[in-house]
From Swiss-Prot:
Residues 27-169, 172-314, 317-462, 468-611 form the Jacalin-type lectin domain. Keywords: Lectin, Repeat. GO terms for molecular function: carbohydrate binding. Pfam families: Jacalin. InterPro entries: Jacalin-like_lectin_dom, Jacalin-like_lectin_dom_plant, Jacalin-like_lectin_dom_sf. This is Jacalin-related lectin 14. SMART domains: Jacalin. It comes from Arabidopsis thaliana. Belongs to the jacalin lectin family. The gene is JAL14.
Amino acid sequence: MERNLLSILMRRRLAERNRDAIELAAVQKMEVIGSTEGYTFDDGSDHDDVTKIFVGGGRQGIHYIEFEYVKNGQLESGVHLGVRYRGFTETFEINHLNNEHLESVEGYYDYGSGYIQGLQFKTNFRVSELIGYDEGTKFSLSVKGKRIIGFHGYMKERKIISLGGYFSWIHPRKMEAKGSKGGNQWDDGTNNDGVTKIHVRGGVEGIQYIKFDYVRKSGQHINGSIHGLSGSGFTQTFEIDHLNNEHLVCVEGYYDDESGVIQALQFKTNIKTSELLGYKKGKKFSLVDKRKKIVGFHGYADKNLNSLGAYFTTVSPTKSECYGSSKGIYWDDGVFDFIRTVYVSSNVMNVRYIKFHYYNRAVVVRQHGWNSIVEEDGEKEFELDYPNELITSVEGTMKSFSRSEIRISSLTFKTSKGRTSPTIGIASGTKFLLASKGCAVVGFYGRHDDRDLVAIGAYFSPLPPPTAEKLQAQGGNQGDSWDDGVFEGVRKLYVGQGKNCVAFLKVVYDSNTQVVIGEDHGNKTLFEVKEYELEYPSEYITAVDGCYNKVNGTEVEVITMLRIQTNKRTSIPVGCESNSSFVLKKEGYKIVGFHGKASNMINQLGVHVVPLTE
């Protein structure tokens, strides 16, 4: 009976995989929006991506459109639709070599004239200007999780009267499994929108099993399969709130070569970081791909988890509102990996130009506004600590000089390290803010005329989770090593004094709003144990200073004094000062964990730090 049940479960699982494979391979044709009373055109779906779009139009709407595609690295032209004549012509290029793809088309259709009036194209990196007019009924061609690979539609009297598209899944990138290939290979697949819950079972030998719950692209929730076997040990879970745009971006862990078993795992989302689940033993590894999220896992497992790999897909940036004038020349820098430097020139009236030094494997310079540097226009520079510092918001003002003339009058930049640039320009007029919670600026767009910057907006992408840095421990070399690990922050410390030394340390941490009580290090004595409670989360530890020395006429060095510094106050020292002093601190960082060595006293102390964010 058990064999029959197992056979049924295996057949069901195989059927699900086959169905997923068919869904992933299928091209979806979205029917046209607009009129069908004309001549049909169809570029087909036998393309990898759209690379360039030409659009022409006039007073009656869009009368010319042409698409360029790529197939197996070769460029292909679609059907020439309509006729180019007097009016406007715009070109929108898509950099498929940088993994940019077309995700949607929005437009306006006028039922009175029967013509498409305007079109706007959105990729996974940027959004085009509206080409044409926002008159009539708005429509959209888009399918969640898919990209456009072809177009079809109708035309009449040399004008475009309807448009439809062909869609294909955006295939996630497979990152090979870290660990050994012992045991049975497993693969959860890629037909998911995200990970919602992770179940980890650990034991003496390492991670026994892992299980992932997913949300499908259709919105259906899937309880994943167990990979490995359950034994005596601990089970921990980590939940991800996908309904509030939280997604998994990184997995770190440890793998033991000798046993061939994953020893520990830690999960990071765009919002929070889990505890280290398991033991810090063996080689460290990570599964991460910049500006992408994890949508599936694969690996090997038998009695324990032997290896783990992941599937990544792009997280599309969001585009803020553009503040300022709707007139002038439209510009759009798109999306970059980093912003290294911002230059702004202003006079007593307004901002003249803005210049960015972006970085995408090389420095890319973009300047918008007045192109000539004039002596009275002082250029101000704001340099970021690339790649560790990101712009998180831009405050500005815009000023009306007449009913139709609006200009940007000032700009101020804030960063992920809590720095604020000087205000560049004169802060007068209407205030505006470019910001998105939990995100960093990855590009700008806007408008300029022949003299000044008249409008500005920004692209935002989720901030990467802060990466902890382990600062070297200070003190003696005797005692047993210990490491509390990395947490969201510190809530409370207990520091106990011994005879001429610090004898005891215990730390209470915060992990995803949950209180985590650290282990005892050293021994309590008859002396008082001092308690330091922080006003968490507004208060955090910025530094620990102390002293160490040999005690009791021996060669054993121990910590003799500790003092805690926060962003709000400095504690009274515990212990006695001695000749050898130290400071555990990194500018612009906060302490989120402790490590060191201990016997019946605290012999050595070090810290884990992460960059300060807003």
